Amino acid sequence: MLSVGDNAPEFNLNDQDGKLVQLSDFKGKKLVIYFYPKDQTPGCIKEACSFRDNIESYKKHDIAVLGVSIDSEKSHQNFMSKQELNFPLLADVEKEMVNSYEVWGEKSMYGRKYMGTFRKTFLINETGSIDKIYEKVKVATHAEDVLTDWEIS
């Protein structure tokens, strides 16, 4: 199980435009990686828009933000366009990253069990270690909560 202090697992995924993005691209920089279940769903829209609305504070402090789901590049393009998102979304269609970050598993809704992505966020420091893991997220204020925890707000 991933814990604070562990090295963040490497990843190599395409963003919404088909550009390869890797953990090593962010060496020397703080990074927020937030995993979410599905493009264009109510909670995911609120969370993404929270980061969108706070992205200038992140940029000002040289912090990158990545959203990750198992949706396709095309789905991400549509999501970004509709919500006017201003940070990359990674397409983990093969479920490599959701598995390496341990956010893929059995979920339950209305008594029905299914496999899906848990809403979870990782704060990665400049050396590539995990500074914090958010197991529970308040979608509407999550971006502000991260800034507060990194003492940036």
Q: Where would I find each of the regions flagged by the language model?
A:
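Chalcogenol-based redox active-site neighborhoods
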Residues: 1-153
